[in-house]
Amino acid sequence: MAGFKRGYDGKIAGLYDLDKTLGRGHFAVVKLARHVFTGEKVAVKVIDKTKLDTLATGHLFQEVRCMKLVQHPNIVRLYEVIDTQTKLYLILELGDGGDMFDYIMKHEEGLNEDLAKKYFAQIVHAISYCHKLHVVHRDLKPENVVFFEKQGLVKLTDFGFSNKFQPGKKLTTSCGSLAYSAPEILLGDEYDAPAVDIWSLGVILFMLVCGQPPFQEANDSETLTMIMDCKYTVPPRVSAGCRDLITRMLQRDPKRRASLEEIESHPWLQGVDPSPATKYNIPLVSYKNLSEEEHNSIIQRMVLGDIADRDAIVEALETNRYNHITATYFLLAERILREKQEKEIQTRSASPSNIKAQFRQSWPTKIDVPQDLEDDLTATPLSHATVPQSPARAGDSVLNGHRSKGLCDPAKKDELPELAGPALSTVPPASLKPAASGRKCLFRVEEDEEEDEEDKKPVSLSTQVVLRRKPSVTNRLTSRKSAPVLNQIFEEGESDDEFDMDENLPPKLSRLKMNIASPGTVHKRYHRRKSQGRGSSCSSSETSDDDSESRRRLDKDSGLAYSWHRRDSSEGPPGSEGDGGGQSKPSGGGGVDKASPGEQGTGGSGQGGSGGTPSGTAGSSRRCAGPDSSSSSPASAAPRGAELVQSLKLVSLCLGSQLHGAKYILDPQKALLSSVKVQERSTWKMCISAPGPGPSADLDPVRTKKLRNNVLQLPLCEKTISVNIQRSRKEGLLCASSPASCCHVI
């Protein structure tokens, strides 16, 4: 203890930082302090021993002994005792809600009985615990009951007049406060220890429900007279049960007063938890309440913090010391328990409405697909392409208010083919029907203009395979209306500096999920996007009629061909060079012209771009091929709409091929489709158009089906490709009805 015996100079031996004063007494002052090692706030009762006489000194050490003895969740905990030559420091648990007297004074007519019952039951529970240990408080009053708002508890404090008693043996010391003291103490007679606390409990309950003390007159003499005569008036608003309990406790004759057992079993106190504190272990009354892992973790932190070695810590705990070692241990332990309790409360209090609010805030930029939604999808996702489920979105209630149309009618699920292993069998277009309107949709923007067009009848489409990827963090300022909905690949955690990686290592593809979307749902998405617009360079009046006609021909044959163009990460922004030539490349690079096929603009840098299209009339940036656009390639018969499935599955083929060390995405010797231009591995762009007849129409169906199945069996690698999907020249199958509806996926 030699290290602790320093004078008071704002700090206690460097162990506590003292702050403002919380209260003062005759011989003591209570200060707010911070435990230096743990950072926890505590209350420090500083007692000046030079002002104490022999009797007061005896009471002081009696208080310390009693507080060491009583360790209860409804009693303020004593952490440490620091004794110096002139002062005694008691390190106590800090209450955050003030005392009960101030709380009662804020309610002139008292608390409602339900709340009063809750607090009074906790006080009775604490006093009952003390009496079982043969400790009498002798100074029960609202000023010595402290609120702990974060824990929802009240706790007893100030055991300065407490003492040990033996059952059947009376005490003689007169102590306490006049307005709350029992008549026998004021008379100076011998008294039964538990009975004086029962009287004080009656006064506290009266104040809780009435808002004022039962015995309070103009002066102490009149107050003493009222106490001796036991005269008080209970307001008529107090219930009969509460009135009866008060009367049972405020009895002039101690032998007629109710015992603690009778109080606890009184009808008015039934139906209330006597101590909610028993549900938690804060404050921790024993180190044995901790798990072995938590116990060892705390000891390890103390050893590393040079508080003491392991043997000294264990010895201090086992001998129930009240020194800095045990104080540090219990403060650390209570922090762990408090954090655990807060997590449990947050988990229980997480309501669906709160989850919805968080979901809406993140809607415009990041669209998460909870794992629970897999049952609502018409295709079983690949085992390696899952999305981790967030606890905030674990419930089905997350979807309420955000989805109103479905991907698949549950009644139609039985019509889907069985999936065996990782392979996905080809689903014929006729096997899927438009989604039912009552089913919830996976992605839907809640906007009024979208709701107005939901009554449009969907047109049957072929089955489409959709790859979704979360958006890059660099695109978080994208407006809601321009947020991608379908046929897109999103990436989570993508940053701009990832594109500076080696060309053989494209940016990391974090998570992919393959699902089959309902044709009706797809059609509705594109129809709504027509009304929203996407900042296009094509007016909606130019193509609206043709687009409507193309939607009516969706079930007819469509010409599809597949062309692949290399696109480097250094590619410039749209319209950076050329006369409205759209997306361009620096001189010498493989530029790609994004003008429409019919109005080919200056592609990239013109003569410098090895991959650019021949220059022609200047076109607008990001132009789409309209139905009336002319084409240099003759149109002819093409594969059915089901070939659209194959086109998107080629994306998986490219992903799978990234696993191999070959230089090319597709082996030139084994390419099945002559329309697939073999390029070196890099970031890729896919265009679906109908420039002319494709030899894919003559492919062997068996080989084609085998190719599809093999594509879906290829595992996805940790790399990515960039896919740009453009609609066909005549059909507009992948686009909205508005002219500038290219689905740019970067």
Curated annotation (Swiss-Prot):
<feature type="modified residue" description="Phosphoserine">
    <location>
        <position position="162"/>
    </location>
</feature>
<feature type="modified residue" description="Phosphoserine">
    <location>
        <position position="495"/>
    </location>
</feature>
<feature type="modified residue" description="Phosphoserine">
    <location>
        <position position="482"/>
    </location>
</feature>
<feature type="active site" description="Proton acceptor">
    <location>
        <position position="139"/>
    </location>
</feature>
<dbReference type="InterPro" id="IPR017441">
    <property type="entry name" value="Protein_kinase_ATP_BS"/>
</dbReference>
<dbReference type="Pfam" id="PF00069">
    <property type="entry name" value="Pkinase"/>
</dbReference>
<feature type="compositionally biased region" description="Acidic residues">
    <location>
        <begin position="494"/>
        <end position="503"/>
    </location>
</feature>
<dbReference type="GO" id="GO:0005634">
    <property type="term" value="C:nucleus"/>
</dbReference>
<feature type="compositionally biased region" description="Low complexity">
    <location>
        <begin position="533"/>
        <end position="542"/>
    </location>
</feature>
<dbReference type="GO" id="GO:0106310">
    <property type="term" value="F:protein serine kinase activity"/>
</dbReference>
<dbReference type="InterPro" id="IPR000719">
    <property type="entry name" value="Prot_kinase_dom"/>
</dbReference>
<feature type="modified residue" description="Phosphothreonine; by LKB1">
    <location>
        <position position="173"/>
    </location>
</feature>
<protein>
    <recommendedName>
        <fullName>SNF-related serine/threonine-protein kinase</fullName>
        <ecNumber>2.7.11.1</ecNumber>
    </recommendedName>
</protein>
<dbReference type="GO" id="GO:0005524">
    <property type="term" value="F:ATP binding"/>
</dbReference>
<keyword id="KW-0539">Nucleus</keyword>
<keyword id="KW-0597">Phosphoprotein</keyword>
<feature type="binding site">
    <location>
        <begin position="22"/>
        <end position="30"/>
    </location>
    <ligand>
        <name>ATP</name>
    </ligand>
</feature>
<feature type="compositionally biased region" description="Low complexity">
    <location>
        <begin position="615"/>
        <end position="638"/>
    </location>
</feature>
<feature type="domain" description="Protein kinase">
    <location>
        <begin position="16"/>
        <end position="269"/>
    </location>
</feature>
<feature type="binding site">
    <location>
        <position position="45"/>
    </location>
    <ligand>
        <name>ATP</name>
    </ligand>
</feature>
<keyword id="KW-0808">Transferase</keyword>
<feature type="region of interest" description="Disordered">
    <location>
        <begin position="494"/>
        <end position="638"/>
    </location>
</feature>
<dbReference type="InterPro" id="IPR015940">
    <property type="entry name" value="UBA"/>
</dbReference>
<feature type="modified residue" description="Phosphoserine">
    <location>
        <position position="390"/>
    </location>
</feature>
<feature type="modified residue" description="Omega-N-methylarginine">
    <location>
        <position position="534"/>
    </location>
</feature>
<comment type="similarity">
    <text>Belongs to the protein kinase superfamily. CAMK Ser/Thr protein kinase family.</text>
</comment>
<keyword id="KW-0418">Kinase</keyword>
<comment type="function">
    <text>May play a role in hematopoietic cell proliferation or differentiation. Potential mediator of neuronal apoptosis.</text>
</comment>
<keyword id="KW-0547">Nucleotide-binding</keyword>
<feature type="region of interest" description="Disordered">
    <location>
        <begin position="383"/>
        <end position="414"/>
    </location>
</feature>
<dbReference type="GO" id="GO:0043523">
    <property type="term" value="P:regulation of neuron apoptotic process"/>
</dbReference>
<feature type="compositionally biased region" description="Gly residues">
    <location>
        <begin position="600"/>
        <end position="614"/>
    </location>
</feature>
<feature type="modified residue" description="Phosphoserine">
    <location>
        <position position="518"/>
    </location>
</feature>
<dbReference type="GO" id="GO:0000287">
    <property type="term" value="F:magnesium ion binding"/>
</dbReference>
<feature type="compositionally biased region" description="Gly residues">
    <location>
        <begin position="575"/>
        <end position="592"/>
    </location>
</feature>
<feature type="modified residue" description="Phosphoserine">
    <location>
        <position position="362"/>
    </location>
</feature>
<dbReference type="GO" id="GO:0006468">
    <property type="term" value="P:protein phosphorylation"/>
</dbReference>
<feature type="domain" description="UBA">
    <location>
        <begin position="291"/>
        <end position="334"/>
    </location>
</feature>
<feature type="compositionally biased region" description="Basic and acidic residues">
    <location>
        <begin position="549"/>
        <end position="558"/>
    </location>
</feature>
<feature type="compositionally biased region" description="Basic residues">
    <location>
        <begin position="522"/>
        <end position="532"/>
    </location>
</feature>
<dbReference type="GO" id="GO:0004674">
    <property type="term" value="F:protein serine/threonine kinase activity"/>
</dbReference>
<keyword id="KW-0479">Metal-binding</keyword>
